[in-house]
Amino acid sequence: MNKTVELVKQWGIFEEKHPDGSIEDFCRYLLIHQRESESKLPLAGGVIPMIPAGLLLKLIGRINRLNMNYAYSALEGTGLNQLEEFGMLLYVQQEKNPRKTDVIHAHLLELSSGTDMLNRLKSRGFIAEQTDREDKRSKRLQLTASGEQAIEKGIQRVKKMATMMTHHMAEEDMLLCIKLLKGIDQKFSALFSSHKGKSFDEAYGEVMESTVSNF
């Protein structure tokens, strides 16, 4: 096949899958697709899912679990015990004076477990709590000086951990992964709260129906 025709064909395939993708994304896609087709690295972790979607989610889940486990040791000496605590402090720092429930929902936590985690951070002196002036039923959070210090210590450790976990990847590969996966994160982060209390079949039906209606 003529190389120009083949290139146009590959662009059509890419554009259909990633309509917002740039030419730079397409070039990364071609290079990685070629490289991965030649890769013979075995997969870790036992049973291999039967469909690509299952394998992708399994890999994401395993990497996340490994990341969480390394975080326990990486955060030693910072006053923080897990990545969720570090993430919550960062959220409070960035949002300045967020509502307690907003912090919990932003981290996709159940209200009870999220409240417990925030209470532990409060008891360690990392955050302070005050009543919302506009809604007396709500609480707002503020970072303390100790919380700022914990973030300063933690951010260096988390950066080192992220570098360690991805040191074998080229930056363009990471950027492409972000480009390809952020749509899933955005979509289901928006849907997650509305799916609480519904059966899986109901959630599945809503997602698939909206997908079909967009074509």
Predicted regions and their residues:
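Charged, amphipathic alpha-helical coiled-coil/dimerization segments
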Residues: 2, 120-175
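N-terminal helix-turn-helix DNA-binding core of bacterial DNA-binding proteins
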Residues: 72-109, 113
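Terminal interaction helix/tail motif
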Residues: 158-215
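Long, hydrophobic, amphipathic alpha-helical segments used as structural scaffolds
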Residues: 71-75, 79, 107, 169, ...
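N-terminal leader segment of winged-helix/HTH proteins
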Residues: 1-78
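A generic alpha-helix surface/boundary motif
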Residues: 69, 86, 159-160
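Generic structural concept
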Residues: 60, 64, 92-93, 144, ...
